[in-house]
Curated annotation (Swiss-Prot):
<dbReference type="GO" id="GO:0000049">
    <property type="term" value="F:tRNA binding"/>
</dbReference>
<dbReference type="GO" id="GO:0003735">
    <property type="term" value="F:structural constituent of ribosome"/>
</dbReference>
<dbReference type="InterPro" id="IPR000235">
    <property type="entry name" value="Ribosomal_uS7"/>
</dbReference>
<comment type="function">
    <text>One of the primary rRNA binding proteins, it binds directly to 16S rRNA where it nucleates assembly of the head domain of the 30S subunit. Is located at the subunit interface close to the decoding center, probably blocks exit of the E-site tRNA.</text>
</comment>
<dbReference type="Pfam" id="PF00177">
    <property type="entry name" value="Ribosomal_S7"/>
</dbReference>
<dbReference type="InterPro" id="IPR023798">
    <property type="entry name" value="Ribosomal_uS7_dom"/>
</dbReference>
<keyword id="KW-0820">tRNA-binding</keyword>
<dbReference type="GO" id="GO:0006412">
    <property type="term" value="P:translation"/>
</dbReference>
<protein>
    <recommendedName>
        <fullName>Small ribosomal subunit protein uS7</fullName>
    </recommendedName>
</protein>
<keyword id="KW-0699">rRNA-binding</keyword>
<dbReference type="GO" id="GO:0015935">
    <property type="term" value="C:small ribosomal subunit"/>
</dbReference>
<keyword id="KW-0694">RNA-binding</keyword>
<dbReference type="InterPro" id="IPR005717">
    <property type="entry name" value="Ribosomal_uS7_bac/org-type"/>
</dbReference>
<dbReference type="InterPro" id="IPR036823">
    <property type="entry name" value="Ribosomal_uS7_dom_sf"/>
</dbReference>
<dbReference type="InterPro" id="IPR020606">
    <property type="entry name" value="Ribosomal_uS7_CS"/>
</dbReference>
<comment type="similarity">
    <text>Belongs to the universal ribosomal protein uS7 family.</text>
</comment>
<comment type="subunit">
    <text>Part of the 30S ribosomal subunit. Contacts proteins S9 and S11.</text>
</comment>
Amino acid sequence: MRKRAAKKRPLLPDPRFNDQLVTRFVNNLMWDGKKSTAFKVFYDAMDIVEAKKQDQEKSSVDIWKDALTNVMPHVEVRSRRVGGATFQIPMQIRPDRKISMAMKWMILYSRRRNEKSMAQKLASEVLAAAKEEGAAVKKRMDTHKMAEANKAFSHFRF
């Protein structure tokens, strides 16, 4: 095991929106180290969001950030063994893990959509999540329901 927690490496902001969160999302989106392809997919998706959006005041990145906020879970259940039985214990999630989970869910459920390109799938999932719809938001709701159902075990904190 490590002696201390690994230091966080600084992320460079992306070239188009100058935002570190976008770079973090693209790093999750990337396959086989193909970062330029991942950036192209993300930027194409943002162009599609820009074309399809209803709210004219907000930029496509603001809509994406709203979608990410709507997908972020606040509590999760973790397994803990107590006297031979395994309990699902609800716990608060730290802020950086909330963001990571939201990004991963959004990408996962985008990939599962039935559309032509990944950019179209991602754009559709972003627009759906911004309206509090879509599979990624459903995943957050299910996670919260699971935590609510197991509230009785919350005294078994880690």
